[in-house]
């Protein structure tokens, strides 16, 4: 946290992120709950605040920070209800996979988390769908593509059965991952179909979440089809780059420039 950030927080110009609040409480050696009580989230319970921080870490891919929080919360035993225990196990699995690279242990933790509430595989809750999707992502990263695709299809079917889903971005993530894995298995036409569904959904939800990645995925899959319109691909890639620049995703900006735009320049100026 820079001095300029601290000054802005003191003047009320910006609000500190939940991750920063958590780290600040650790630095000061005080109960994080007392820090959260001073923020606008004071009505929320301690566990809900920590869960919010954990989700924030996951979304921002801050896995080492998440690892520290999981370790601390396991020792403190604040997560007592079945749902809270499930949430902690789920995020422990994420850090075990992302930080320790232990697929087997991570999948065992996810299975354990799922069994805490699972009653019917054909009627999953929103949380159970999220846990199943994490399983699919792990299998995909492990190049077990068919397993991953089957789980993601089940997740999508179950999500579509929910009457009042609280977080529609879960569906967006399922569609994105399904398109990604289908692309890896050379099922490019079906992958493009899901890219298009995802793009429409993101626009309908008024969110930039995964929109750039969906455009890039569509362009990537189109390039792998024998018949593709170069102008269409260029237009799609420009949209992806624009969104990556807008959302300051430096890693993805680098990838799209190296994998597409620099190659196009070489073709034009050999």
Identify the function of each model-found stretch.
Residues 1-8:
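Short alpha-helical DNA-recognition segment
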Residues 19-34:
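DNA major-groove recognition helix of helix-turn-helix/homeodomain DNA-binding modules
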Residues 57, 96-97, 132, 139, ...:
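Residue at a conserved register position within TPR or TPR-like alpha-solenoid repeats
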Residues 60, 99-100, 135, 142, ...:
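Structural motif corresponding to the intra-repeat A-B loop/turn of tetratricopeptide repeats
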């Amino acid at each position: 946290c820079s001095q300029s950030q601290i000054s802005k927080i003191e003047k009320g110009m910006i609000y500190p992120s939940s991750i920063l609040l958590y780290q600040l409480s650790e630095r000061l050696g005080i109960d994080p709950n007392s820090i959260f009580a001073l923020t606008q989230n004071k009505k929320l319970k301690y566990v809900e605040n920590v869960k919010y921080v954990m989700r924030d870490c996951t979304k921002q891919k801050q896995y080492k920070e998440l690892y520290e929080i999981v370790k601390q919360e396991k020792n403190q035993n604040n997560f007592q209800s079945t749902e809270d225990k499930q949430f902690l196990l789920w995020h422990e699995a994420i850090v075990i996979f992302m930080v320790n690279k232990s697929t087997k242990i991570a999948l065992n933790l996810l299975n354990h988390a799922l069994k805490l509430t699972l009653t019917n595989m054909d009627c999953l809750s929103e949380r159970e769908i999220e846990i199943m999707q994490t399983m699919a992502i792990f299998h995909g990263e492990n190049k077990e593509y068919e397993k991953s695709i089957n789980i993601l299809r089940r997740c999508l079917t179950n999500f579509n059965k929910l009457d009042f889903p609280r977080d529609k971005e879960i569906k967006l993530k399922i569609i994105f991952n399904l398109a990604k894995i289908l692309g890896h298995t050379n099922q490019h036409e079906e992958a493009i179909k899901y890219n298009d569904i995802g793009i429409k959904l993101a626009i309908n939800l008024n969110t930039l979440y995964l929109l750039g990645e969906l455009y890039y995925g569509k362009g990537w899959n189109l390039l792998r089809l024998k018949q593709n319109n170069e102008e269409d691909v260029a237009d799609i890639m420009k949209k992806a780059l624009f969104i990556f620049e807008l959302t300051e995703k430096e890693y993805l900006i680098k990838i799209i420039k190296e994998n597409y735009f620099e190659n196009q320049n070489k073709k034009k100026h050999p």
